[in-house]
Amino acid sequence: MSIWDTLFGRTPRYTPGTEPDHSFGRYTDAYKSRENYAAWDRAVDAFEEDRFLDSCAAFLEYLRDEREDNVKWQREENRLYFEFYQGSKRVTGFADREQLRATARIARLERPDTDPLRRLTAMNYELKYSRFALDADDCLTIIFDTPVIDASPHKLYHALKEMALRADKQDDLLLEEFGGTLSPVEVTHLAPLSAEEKRLKLQFLRESIQSVIDYLGGGAINPEEHPGAVAYLLLELVYRLDYLLIPEGHTMEALERMHRMYFAREAEQPVTFKNVRLLGELQSLLRRAPEAFAEELYGGKSTFGITLPASHDRLSGLIRNELPNMDWYQDNGFPEVARAIPGYIAGYALFNYAVPPPDRDLLQLYYRVSENVYFQGLGYRQEFLGRDGRPARRPLKAAIGEIVERHRREYPRMRPVTSHLSFDNFADFGRSYLEMVGELDLSRP
């Protein structure tokens, strides 16, 4: 920052490329490179020509994400060995002229206990391609195998995705529930977070939940008269915690359960009842031991995403449907609820959809502004709020321009109208920002 910026209270210029490289949100494999898609075509062609090992090798090349360094393979004569990562789990396997087999160890059974075995046996009925088993080393394992003649790229994708996602989800849940019986296995690939980052994330979790609880308990809004407002506040919080903290295990399952519960088609449950359940779940997270939450925070690589790809039109429709609901709350003295609605839209989209990369980057930039203090704590130096607490015009427009340049090759028609952005207050900024995002042209020539 120059002396003139300091004297006049200006926000420093946007300086891309100098920020830390933290990951946020759920991994998606929905948008691959041209090289990945070319590898898929080779895999299909090789399978149709009965060149099964060539097909498997090309399929693994399709799965590989260079940024994640998530898939490795090696061919030795008539065998192909491979491994890939999904969060906390490593999947290993091989293919030869007869079969393809993949396994992932979930946890080690330290002493006989039928409860976790019964749990996984019951889950086998939910699986289409894979199965849980106990291996020779007393490790709870998930297995997929198939004759190579039946190992088409389409089948391999769905089967390996099923086993990888199940393994990644179940290890933390089983270890928490059966900690006296099970122990972690094959977790050396995980990148531990620093104690300071864990402390910061725990603080963010607790302060965010407590802030909403305090607002609802302060009498500013009647939850019986305005259940929709309460729902916006609670769901915005759920999606924000999921995207910014990326928790695993119990916390991730709790956040997903809250989403499922609220949107379950249960005609007899009024919104007020669902809000009470949401609030109870959030209070339970608040009461958890810090060390339990800390164990759910780690860095890992992923290969498969759990969100389905969605077009820009889907996001635009969500914005058009939800954004007008801000009007009543702004006009009737509920600024906190009005501010929560753009956050709800951004969070809902990132939680449920694999939106196009420009949309994802722009929605994350929204979080950079709304949670400026949190990002500063993570080491991001760029300020997106001025000293008066309002969104900062210059760095925001520069950051939007940098996102446009990053995606210009794939989306040459993307031209955000930044002149319509409002910087008067955060609610107006959120409205104008999402309107700008919704009006983008992400069609390709």
For each predicted feature, which ranges?
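Charge-dense, extended regions
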Residues: 325-445
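Charged, low-complexity interaction regions
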Residues: 217-226, 242-250, 328-331, 415-419
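Short amphipathic C-terminal alpha-helix that caps PH/PH-like domains
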Residues: 156-170
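Charged, long alpha-helical assembly modules
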Residues: 234-337
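Charged, amphipathic alpha-helical linkers/stalks
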Residues: 175-232
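Short, internal acidic amphipathic alpha-helical interface segments
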Residues: 103-137
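N-terminal catalytic cores of peptidoglycan-degrading enzymes
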Residues: 3-105, 109
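Well-ordered alpha/beta subsegment
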Residues: 134-158
